[in-house]
């Protein structure tokens, strides 16, 4: 069972992933290390808010999605 708070957090993360497009950065990484590339990585930086009504702390959640080319 997912708590209401967790559901909201997952929804925010999913929304941020849909809205981000960081392909250019990945291409730069790939060009730099083209000889020995095994993994292509998409890096998503999502802003999530933690705290109660009065105090909101902004934290960054970094998600790495690794694609293996076989």
Swiss-Prot record:
Q: Which domain of life is it from?
A: Eukaryota
Q: Which UniProt keywords apply?
A: Malaria
The record makes one more remark, namely:
This antigen is expressed in all erythrocytic forms.
Under what name is this protein listed? PPF2L antigen
Q: Which organism is it from?
A: Plasmodium falciparum (isolate Palo Alto / Uganda)
């Amino acid at each position: 069972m997912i708590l209401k708070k967790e559901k909201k957090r997952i929804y925010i993360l999913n929304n941020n992933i849909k809205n981000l497009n960081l392909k250019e950065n990945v291409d730069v990484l790939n060009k730099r290390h083209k000889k020995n590339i095994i993994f292509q990585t998409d890096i998503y930086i999502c802003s999530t808010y933690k705290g109660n009504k009065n105090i909101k702390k902004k934290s960054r959640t970094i998600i790495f999605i690794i694609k293996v080319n076989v």
